[in-house]
Amino acid sequence: MRNKKTLVVMAGGTGGHVFPGLAVADALKEQGWAVSWLGTADRMEAQLVPKHGYEIDFIDIAGIRGNGLKRLLMAPIRIIKSIWQARSVLKKRRVDLVLGMGGFASGPGGIAAWSMGIPVILHEQNAVAGLTNRILSLFSKRVLMGFSGAFKSGKAILVGNPVRKQLVDLPVKKISSEDVALKVLVVGGSLGAKVLNDLLPAVFSSFDNENFNIMHQSGEGHYQAVQKGYEQRLVKANVQEFITDMASAYDWADLVICRAGALTVAELAVVGLPAIFVPLPHAVDDHQTKNAQYLVSQEAAVLIAQKELTAKKISDYLRLFLQNRKLLTAMSQKSRKAAIIDATESVASICNQLV
């Protein structure tokens, strides 16, 4: 006889899906749940999830939108195959509940669970629900939102975006005083951002080295180019391919220059960190711009569309913040006020209600 409730988390592709899933998984594991993962073997979750102590099963599925006619025509066959693969996994795991957090595996996994009578909880991190989640919401017992308005359905519940406990536990942000260097963190997401990698070394070269302390996450495969960009301009910067301890990086920084993935926006709010957002222009339904607007509307961040991005625009903002730390402090306080810090607990509680 089983004593533990069993959960399969379906989340993958990017850190924006995986890390919120891990936050909920950790919370439920502490409560005695048995948690495993469903994902794809060629995406981030394949390496990241086992490192955090969770078993992962794989199904064969890839994105459909914007990937050409051949893939579109083959999609029904691939989807049916992946649903049967997911059914096999769920049967083997003797699952009580599945939690869909986004990524390629969520759709087939959610439909497989529904077909087996296993309750599905869906969480949409972005301000605009993606295609997979719009479909999966029809098969879900609970539909949860990171941002208000992501779903038009009246049954959708606003819970916020789960973030890691170590971020919630960070002390209240204190912005550096004007007599010391401004600490700037540049993050292009887990995969990097070429436009930030290319532009920021030139931007910082227009200031004295004493003005800024710089930490720059280049993304996988871009370290050497970014490091060279700073060195050629005689700019001191701590360049890292991937920052493994993001809690310490957030705690260190006064300001972030970054994309506007849902997880990034949620994390910045929780830690009270002002931001210059440069949303990914190719994001489906322009959801990153809508994510960023949440903090911009609270006067906790500023936004520069990539098509309007210039070295001068970023330099002007940096000069403003360099000379006006009170403004950054006010933005920090407004950011923290906008945070939903109990999102992880809310999702975990809803999981417990259904089993």
UniProtKB/Swiss-Prot annotation:
Organism: Psychromonas ingrahamii (strain DSM 17664 / CCUG 51855 / 37)
Single Gene Ontology MF annotation: UDP-N-acetyl-D-glucosamine:N-acetylmuramoyl-L-alanyl-D-glutamyl-meso-2,6-diaminopimelyl-D-alanyl-D-alanine-diphosphoundecaprenol 4-beta-N-acetylglucosaminlytransferase activity
One annotated Gene Ontology cellular component of this protein: plasma membrane
EC number from the UniProt entry: 2.4.1.227
Function: Cell wall formation. Catalyzes the transfer of a GlcNAc subunit on undecaprenyl-pyrophosphoryl-MurNAc-pentapeptide (lipid intermediate I) to form undecaprenyl-pyrophosphoryl-MurNAc-(pentapeptide)GlcNAc (lipid intermediate II).
Enzymatic class: transferase
Biological process (GO), any one: regulation of cell shape
Pathway: Cell wall biogenesis; peptidoglycan biosynthesis
The UniProt record lists the keyword Cell cycle: yes
Keywords: Cell cycle, Cell division, Cell inner membrane, Cell membrane, Cell shape, Cell wall biogenesis/degradation, Glycosyltransferase, Membrane, Peptidoglycan synthesis, Transferase
Residues reported to bind UDP-N-acetyl-alpha-D-glucosamine: T14, G15, G16, N126, R164, S190, I243, A262, L263, T264, V265, A266, E267, Q288
Catalysis performed (reactions): di-trans,octa-cis-undecaprenyl diphospho-N-acetyl-alpha-D-muramoyl-L-alanyl-D-glutamyl-meso-2,6-diaminopimeloyl-D-alanyl-D-alanine + UDP-N-acetyl-alpha-D-glucosamine = di-trans,octa-cis-undecaprenyl diphospho-[N-acetyl-alpha-D-glucosaminyl-(1->4)]-N-acetyl-alpha-D-muramoyl-L-alanyl-D-glutamyl-meso-2,6-diaminopimeloyl-D-alanyl-D-alanine + UDP + H(+)
Membrane topology: Peripheral membrane protein
Protein name as it appears in the record: UDP-N-acetylglucosamine--N-acetylmuramyl-(pentapeptide) pyrophosphoryl-undecaprenol N-acetylglucosamine transferase
Manganese listed as a keyword: no
Record-stated family: Belongs to the glycosyltransferase 28 family. MurG subfamily.
InterPro entries: GlcNAc_MurG, Glyco_trans_28_C, GlycoTrans_28_N
Localization: Cell inner membrane
